[in-house]
Every structure is written in C-alpha cells, then in structure tokens.
C-alpha cells in the first residue's frame, strides 16, 4: 500500500517540559536523589544543564561534573535513570507546584479539529513523560511520541519520528511539513538541523534574545491567544501559487 500523508499533510511535534507544563521541583529533586543514591554525591542543576536535553545527557553531564570516570558512566547512567523513574512515579502524583500552562488544552483541541497528526517530542524517557502527562490527562491528545529513551541526542529524534509515523500510520511527511513546538534554543536548533519548522513559546524572559538569535519560524509569548499559531499553520496549508 502506498504511503499517504494525513488529511492535510502536517505533522505537529510538541515538547512537554516548559512548553505544555511546568513540572515543579519534584523531577529535579527525584533526579538529585537518584544520583546521590548511586554516587554518594550531591549535584545541582542550572537551566542550561536541563533545558532541551534528554534525560541520558542530563545524567551524563551530572556525572561528568562529579568527575565520575567516563568508563563507568554508561552503566551508572542506566541505573540512575531507573532509580529516578521509580522515585518520580512515587513523588510526582503528590506534587503541588506542577502547572498546566493556560491555552494548552485549547491548542491540542485545535490540532485535533484540524486533523493534524500530533506527536510528543520529549527528552524524557517514555515512562517519565507518561508520569508527567498523567495528572493533566494529556495522553489522549497524542497518537505516538519520541523520547530520550529512543535516542540521547535530541537532534536525532525527528528522524525517528518520521520512521515511527510511517511504521504506525503508513504516512510520510517531507521535513518542511513537520512543525516542532518547544520553548528552548535547542528545540529551534533541532528543527532547523532536520529541515523542519519551529514554533517557540517564550517561558523565560532571559531566554528571549537567545531564541530570537536562532530565527524560529514563529515566536509566541503564551498559548492563550492561539491566532498567531493558527494563522501560521493555515498558511502552510495553502498550496504554492494558489
């Protein structure tokens, strides 16, 4: 059977942390505890050591800062990730500081109404993403996803997405028919390096200029006003020279 595209030929990939939700302090505390459990050392995380990175690279960076020999990091990384996910599953349901950003549900409903193929693109492991999505009942909006457990390098995730979509739905998308929605410089870079389009929501004022420097296709301050995103996506649906 020949591969097909979705009804209107757009594939939307949306990031989780910082884009749709603010997960609060619990994930960071869970990871810190997991690292301490396996190394006996405490580590702190700044924004640049977390934003846009996959879980395996976040852990590897922490182990490097703790001067753990490179030969030990791979095995230790797997152990820490397993412990982290166990702690996260126990602690996160009780978190009181997690936030679903305004307009996210409306945005996802709009994608559904437009019959866009929508997937999750996240540096979390698949299990970790599920834990974070569940309290907000967001799983229903995603027919598939690609995660840090698929590949440690974020830039490799889009190609995995295209393969997954073909295998699961028998659909093919040209890179310029794929839109990545995120909140960090790395999201924009990931889209550009794969020939895809990018929409960025600014969640931190101190990151605005760095994001602007990467020239995303569109920047929004929040998802409460969906018109800029709707207009941009509708323009993509207009055939050339129409």
Kindly label every feature range from the protein language model:
Residues 2, 13, 89-120, 130:
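Short, acidic loop-to-helix structural element flanking the phosphoryl-transfer center
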Residues 35, 85-86:
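Membrane-embedded alpha-helical bundles of multi-pass transporters/translocases
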Residues 98, 126-179, 185-194:
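Substrate-recognition "cap/lid" segment bordering the active-site pocket of phosphatases
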Residues 122-124:
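Conserved phosphate-coupling serine/threonine residues in phosphotransfer and NTP-handling enzymes
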């Amino acid at each position: 059977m020949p591969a097909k595209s979705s009804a209107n030929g757009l594939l939307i990939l949306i990031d989780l942390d910082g884009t749709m939700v603010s997960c609060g302090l619990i994930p960071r505390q869970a990871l810190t505890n997991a690292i301490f459990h396996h190394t006996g050392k405490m580590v702190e995380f700044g924004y640049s050591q977390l934003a846009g990175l996959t879980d395996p690279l976040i852990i590897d960076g922490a182990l490097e800062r703790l001067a753990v020999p490179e030969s030990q990091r791979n095995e230790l990384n797997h152990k820490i990730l397993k412990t982290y996910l166990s702690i996260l599953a126990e602690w996160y349901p009780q978190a009181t500081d997690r936030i679903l950003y305004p307009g996210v549900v409306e945005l996802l409903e709009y994608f559904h109404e437009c019959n866009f193929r929508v997937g999750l693109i996240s540096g979390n492991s698949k299990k970790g993403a599920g834990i974070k999505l569940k309290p907000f009942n967001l799983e229903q909006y995603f027919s598939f996803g690609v995660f840090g457990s698929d590949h440690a390098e974020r830039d490799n995730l889009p190609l995995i997405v295209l393969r997954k979509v073909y295998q699961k739905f028998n659909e093919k998308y040209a890179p310029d028919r794929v839109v990545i929605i995120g909140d960090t410089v790395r999201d924009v870079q990931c889209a550009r390096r794969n020939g895809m389009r990018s929409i960025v929501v600014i969640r931190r004022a101190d990151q605005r200029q760095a994001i602007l420097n990467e020239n995303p296709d569109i920047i929004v301050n929040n998802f409460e006003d969906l018109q800029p995103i709707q207009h941009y996506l509708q323009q993509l649906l207009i055939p050339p020279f129409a």
